[in-house]
């Protein structure tokens, strides 16, 4: 009798665990993009190899993502619109437009990533608890205005 009780309890626990949603994930990490006066100007959903960028109301603006190229991996910026246009790339803590013009610098500490204009003016910051390179590049793309329609 005792053996049956243990067996029933085991199966009940197993069924309970199997019934839990498997979508429970720590990703995306969510962070606010702060402007030069430390007020929120946008949102970032950060994944391991890309970041989704949004307006404060959740409207998609674009994405920064690693892409495998012949020379390795590069970060590319894509504007979210009807064309999903490539608008720039990030490399060596710098953000460039499609034509190769330097648009912003970015750097990070343990928790914060900072974005600067080419003249050194601070454009803003974002709290990046993980995946700091892609997170900082995403904030740079958002703050430099590269996701705005031309």
Roles of regions detected by a PLM:
Residues 1-10:
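Bacterial N-terminal signal peptides that target proteins for export
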């Amino acid at each position: 009798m005792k053996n049956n009780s243990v067996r029933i309890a085991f199966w009940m626990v197993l069924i309970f665990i199997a019934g839990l949603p498997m979508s429970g994930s720590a990703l995306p990490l969510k962070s606010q993009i702060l402007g030069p006066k430390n007020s929120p100007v946008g949102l970032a959903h950060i994944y391991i190899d890309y970041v989704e960028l949004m307006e404060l109301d959740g409207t998609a603006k674009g994405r920064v993502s690693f892409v495998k190229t012949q020379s390795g991996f590069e970060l590319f910026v894509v504007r979210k619109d009807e064309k999903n246009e490539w608008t720039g790339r990030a490399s060596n803590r710098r953000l460039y437009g499609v034509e190769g013009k330097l648009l912003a610098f970015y750097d990070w500490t343990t928790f914060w990533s900072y974005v600067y204009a080419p003249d050194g003016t601070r454009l803003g910051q974002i709290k990046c608890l993980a995946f700091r390179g892609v997170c900082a590049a995403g904030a740079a793309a958002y703050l430099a205005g590269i996701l705005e329609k031309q």
